[in-house]
């Protein structure tokens, strides 16, 4: 992260608030869990979950979003690089910084289009 002349941090890859559901699976576990993607960039995600996930854990994640009348997703393989306790009204859990380690090119294109889109995620259209 760089510091601008005005003293504000500038990221190489800007983050976009998303508020989208995701499913994740710890690489060594047979079951899936859920959470919310708070924001994203081309290199990482800020995710929210009620589960306590250790730093360094590798996750397979599918971020879900509507496309017309269907639900679609893009998938990433990532690593938890930081975590914080997080509280909201009637909710307690964790925020995690997830570094994207691997993503298929088609999924990367979907993520980039979602991030660069000026419309709401529910209006995002995936190329056929």
What do these predicted regions represent?
Residues 27, 42, 83-88:
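Short, conserved beta-turn/loop elements at beta-strand boundaries and strand-helix junctions
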């Amino acid at each position: 992260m760089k510091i601008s002349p005005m003293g504000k941090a500038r990221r190489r890859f800007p983050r976009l608030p998303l508020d989208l559901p995701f499913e994740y699976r710890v690489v060594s576990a047979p079951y899936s869990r859920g959470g919310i993607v708070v924001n994203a960039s081309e290199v990482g995600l800020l995710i929210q979950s009620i589960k306590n996930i250790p730093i360094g854990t590798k996750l397979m994640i599918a971020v879900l979003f509507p496309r017309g009348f269907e639900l679609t997703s893009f998938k990433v393989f990532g690593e938890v690089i930081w975590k914080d306790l997080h509280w909201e009204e009637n909710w307690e859990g964790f925020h995690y910084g997830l570094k994207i380690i691997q993503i298929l090119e088609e999924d990367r294109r979907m993520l980039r289009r979602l991030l660069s889109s000026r419309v709401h995620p529910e209006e995002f259209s995936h190329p056929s």
